[in-house]
């Protein structure tokens, strides 16, 4: 079972990635999460199921820091946590941290970098309690960009790079990967309401396209990588021809995801994309 706990509900996925009906979105305010999740677990027969919880983009921060010499992977997160004291708006003692590799071929002479993920300890405790009280067994906590990385990696059959844009109601997220390696993740400040509103649509599309192009340019100029030729787009409003609207302003080709090619018989509810992606298998990044 994979869950993404959002301010307006719970996105879930359980299955083998062969049908869209194995995912869903349970709309609820935070105060009603616990009883509604417990009901969902009982209805689906998930009691005791190993569970991954994914943190949405706005519930964690990621920083690139140089990896200290002589530290084991086991000690790395705790050691680097204290280097975040000037970067966080809360004390490192109230943070829970983990690390994942920064691509060595993108460090551009900055040494051996790692990505340090930080979230509030209170948030982590709340999620552990929520999952446990519902009868699930928490296996791991993931973050949105690594979940989306799984999906981008699956689509990057050539290994030359893939960009994926996921548009939510209030913001978007763009990730760029090469195979299983995440190179870049960016928040895109655009709302679905602005994209739908006739008076604000053109400005919103241009703003979204500009942020996407800037991310592609950064990937090329600052990370020293050849940008992907296409960007795959996932949005909740499938009637809006966003791909063609954005393509006028972005150098790469813009394509909507072909869900049939992903083994689904109908399009996935975009609200479930992160939970669905978190359950995808991903190949290990090549060792250095």
Placement of each model-derived feature along the sequence:
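Hydrophobic/aromatic-enriched cytosolic interaction surfaces used to assemble or bind macromolecules
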Residues: 1-288
């Amino acid at each position: 079972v994979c869950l993404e706990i959002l301010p307006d509900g719970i996105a879930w996925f359980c299955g083998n990635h062969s049908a869209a009906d194995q995912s869903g979105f349970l709309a609820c305010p935070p105060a009603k999460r616990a009883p509604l999740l417990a009901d969902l677990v009982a209805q689906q027969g998930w009691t005791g199921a190993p569970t991954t919880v994914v943190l949405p983009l706005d519930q964690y921060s990621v920083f690139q820091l140089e990896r200290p010499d002589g530290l084991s992977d086991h000690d790395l997160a705790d050691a680097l946590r204290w280097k975040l004291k000037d970067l966080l708006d809360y004390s490192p003692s109230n943070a829970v941290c983990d690390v994942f590799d920064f691509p060595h071929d993108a460090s551009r002479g900055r040494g051996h970098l790692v990505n340090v993920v930080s979230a509030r300890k209170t948030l982590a405790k709340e999620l552990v309690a929520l999952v446990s009280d519902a009868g699930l067994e928490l296996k791991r906590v993931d973050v949105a960009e690594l979940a989306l990385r799984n999906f981008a990696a699956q689509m990057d059959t050539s290994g030359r790079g893939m960009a994926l844009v996921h548009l939510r109601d209030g913001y978007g997220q763009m990730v760029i990967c090469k195979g299983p390696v995440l190179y870049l993740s960016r928040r895109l400040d655009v709302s679905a309401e602005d994209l739908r509103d006739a008076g604000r649509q053109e400005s919103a599309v241009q703003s979204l396209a500009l942020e996407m192009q800037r991310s592609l340019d950064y990937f090329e100029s600052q990370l020293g990588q050849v940008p992907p030729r296409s960007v795959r787009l996932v949005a909740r409003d499938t009637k809006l021809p966003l791909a063609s609207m954005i393509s006028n302003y972005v150098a790469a080709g813009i394509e909507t995801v072909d869900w049939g090619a992903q083994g689904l018989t109908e399009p996935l509810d975009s609200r479930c994309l992160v939970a669905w992606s978190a359950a995808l298998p991903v190949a290990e990044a090549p060792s250095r």
